[in-house]
Amino acid sequence: MPDVQLDVISIDVPFPGASPGEVESGVVTRIEEAVRNIEGIADMRSYSNPSLARVRLDVDTNYDALAILDEVKMAVDRIANLPGSIENPVIYRNQRQQRAISVQIYGDLDEVTMKGLVSTIQDEILSLPSVTKADIQGARPYEISVELKESRLRQYGLSLDDVAKAIRRSSLDLPAGSIRSDFGDILLRAEGQAYRKVDFEKIMLIHKSDGTRLTLGDIAKISDGFQEAQFYSMFNGKPSIGISVFAVGEQNQINISNEVTDYVKTRSQTLPDGISIESWGNGTAYLSESINIMVSNMTMGIVLVLVILGIFLRVQLAFWVMLGMPIAFLGAFALLPLADGSLNLLSLFGFILVLGIVVDDAIIIGESVQTASERDGHSLDNVIRGAKRVAMPATFGVLTTVATFIPLLTVPGGFGALPAAIGSVVVLCLLFSIIESKLILPAHLASMKPLQANDHSPLRQFQNRFADGLKYLVEYKYRPLLIKSINARYTTLAVFVGMLILATGFVMGPYIKTVFFPSMSTDFIRAQVEMVDGTSPAQVVKVIERLNDSLVLLNEEQPEDDKFLKNIAAYVSNTNGNVIAELKPVDSLSQSPENIAVNWRNSVGELSGVKTIQINGAQKSHGHSKDINFKLISPNIKELEVAAELLHQHLRTYDGVYDIENSNTGSIPEINLKIKSSAEALGLALTDLASQVRAAFYGVEAQRLQRGREEVKVMVRYPREERESMGNLESMYIRTRDGDEVPFTAVAELETRVSPSTIRRTWGKRAIIISADINKTITQPGKIVDDVILGDFALQLAQRHPNVRIELGGASQEEDELTQRMLLTTTLALFGIYALMAIPLKSYLQPLIIMGVIPFGMIGALIGHIIVGIPFSALSVYGIIALAGVVVNDSIILVDFVNKSVANGMDIVEAAIKAGTERFRAIMLTSLTTFFGLLPILTETSLSAQLVIPMAVSLGFGILFATVITLILIPCLYVMLNDIKTMRIRLISSRSASSES
């Protein structure tokens, strides 16, 4: 896929140990105020999670995201009142990374040894020539934990903060200047940094004058291990840690994948017994297959186009026409990097899409030259005359096609990268085709030898028979039909309008399924689980194991030839879990990944303690987790919660709506500390109380040290058994500023409450997100969205909760933005097409005739979707937009021919008939080359073609029907325009006569 640079800026601020409410008030609100007035920010969303603040800024497409990023960094740096315990803010521009391959190390090995081995393997992978980014997945960060019991601290009159300060004093490396001697400078340095458990045990806490010494190892339990977090990572049923290898920037994914695969094969021979290493999720295998499929389809398309040209035209002429294709392709390929393009699945399809179109210009020139040569003989003058006759309309015809592809380059969002990758290739190819057909092709055609009259070769005889058959078709089938259509031109128009209305009805009705964002089958199925807050780690693991085992059992129940499972991985993090299954190639499966996902979900049954679960066998092309998404915004939190529940229940009334999620359903039990008035007499303030409780239960960060690639925190805190209950809190002692110790209950009181697990805000106001998935075989996301936003529910919500505002979010918002942008850019493109047609036609009215037939091209596209059996989507619309350019291209040639005949004194009706019959071969040829160039893709069943087939169907089938439009409807409309002019002249004449009388 093309590299996607999203116009989204993220601000992540870790706030260790803080509740969502503290994160909101202490960090999020201050960042929002600092950045809200920066020009160019289109949307601002924030998420206050336990221990983490996240702010997401959408950049307006009319602004430079990198410039906005710099402004955001400066604005955040200027905030002076952020809490002191936060970590450094991380500010970056979002970018979708291309995962090339994953490596999994698994087996029966303890966590410490396993991570050490994985770190070594990570270093070895990063040393490969093509690899620059390889991240460890499914492993906890290292941490040195210093745990001291309350009783031991009291025994020696120490506090946790005292211990942390002692570590900072003794564990450090400090440069101490230098001695400037006559023999040179001698550096002075104190080296005492502790790195391992044994080093920390020797740190001195107390050293009395009588020689009594107390070290950290005497009173503390020191663990050189991992952070306190839930850890569960399995691969094919065994403990595992993974490494994800990414392609960065313009790196070649295939080279990276090949190097890593070769490394894994070699490294597997040196691992200890019981430990395995395996590469999986090889995205480049899919890429290589896709490239091979696209190249084979391109080759087949070229052959088919050449065959069609060889049937209609002289073989030499067909060859020179075809030569324009590689010239245009090479030119586009050379300039593609300058247009921020790359060689990927979609750009390859762009070359296939333009196969038949790129030769249209050359076909028109070549066919005109052949016609002139057949009529007047082959000579340089006749070649020039034939080329000049159609040069002007052919050039502007290609330019109008270019104009129709411009909207594909301006689609916003991540989804916009798909049509943009195609459009950039097509535009470059078409521009090069103009140069080739006008400057190079005529010279080649002039160099051809005259056709030999005594040529009786089988090919020439076949061409003669075909030419005779074509003449018969034109004279005895097409010409009479055209005459009848022109004579009954208003009836003909009515028939076409009726067909258009009928086709539109098919879209609006149940006959053609419509989805804005089509789903795509993949080689993976995924289960994502979020547990209710407060769920024990053991319960989360139990649910993930059940999901894992149920899929393995489902696979084992299949006959040997129908087994679908290749690899399966499971991960748990706090209250979330994921199971990812790699399937065998989709083409070899007896059932679709979507069906496997449904069967998996049914086999699992009810899962206790699960807040949300998603099992997907298809990838959503819009890139969002849900198909529909609504944002409810209000300053009144209670009213907001009621409105959110109302919308949640309303969505449950629709058929086909499932996995409805309410972002406000999660909650965390919270204990609020309050200081008693009696504590003030002891010199205690709330900050003293809070800091000591935080030190005991979260810990004091004594220092951070660098060990190899990882930064390791040194945390000082109570032992785990003294942090597990309310009793532990109530039994702790608080130290006054004078050094005295008082019971916690004597100076503090507790207030229990519940707070949301995540606080969402939009433009500084609280927001709740209601989202859901849609079964597109039952209903359409757009219909649900329109009904909620524009229907009775919106009125009911406004009446009951006037302070609550409802907006679209996620995929729904992107669909709305895409629709608006498509309407705007398509309208501008139509104005551009009109201007480009007005120049060669030298008329303001005749371009309207041609533009009037553009909607009729949709009829063939819709018929194609019915035949192929695919839903009508946004990608289908892009195909119709491209179709408009081809329709206009052929129509300009026809109308220009009529104009020249009329200018020579021919009757308009006769001129229209002559134009149709004489341009029949050229128009038929351009249409057939376009269709047959796309035919291999239209018949493709592979996974890699799913994204591009809707565009190919719209353009391929649409162009066949567009041929009928051009050859029948355009002549009728031309004559009808003359009727209107004649009627206007008569009306003016009659008025003049009346005024004179």
Where are each of the predicted segments found?
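Extracytoplasmic/periplasmic
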Residues: 1-81, 86-89, 111-138, 513-582, ...
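Hydrophobic transmembrane alpha-helices and their membrane-interface caps
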Residues: 303-311, 315-366, 370, 428, ...
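Transmembrane alpha-helices and their membrane-interface boundaries in multi-pass membrane transporters
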Residues: 355-369, 391-410, 417-464, 579, ...
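Extracytoplasmic/periplasmic membrane-proximal domains and adjacent transmembrane bundles
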Residues: 9-12, 54, 80, 124-303, ...
